[in-house]
Amino acid sequence: MEFPKALIKRPNYHFEHPHKRKDKRIGRGFSIGELEKAGLNINNARKLGIIVDIRRKSVHEENVEVLKKFLEQLSNQKS
């Protein structure tokens, strides 16, 4: 089982062509707000191997859903 990756918005650059630009990119880790919405704290997330980006303040619902699915998969494997 692979660990989830966080998606974040890319910055807008004036020199990029809009049709070549991707809206999202893989981030450094999940924000604290995303972990809290998924029912985790920082210590438990790090014990599970989830990377935490403490500098990021944004909360993306896609990342919260990814974390919830990951936790469900973990609970299914344990039982």
From Swiss-Prot:
Disulfide bonds: none annotated. This is Large ribosomal subunit protein eL13. Pfam families: Ribosomal_L13e. Belongs to the eukaryotic ribosomal protein eL13 family. Keywords: Ribonucleoprotein, Ribosomal protein. It comes from the Archaea. GO terms for cellular component: ribonucleoprotein complex; ribosome. One of its GO terms (biological process) is translation. It comes from Saccharolobus islandicus (strain Y.N.15.51 / Yellowstone #2). GO terms for molecular function: structural constituent of ribosome. NCBIfam families: PRK12277.1.
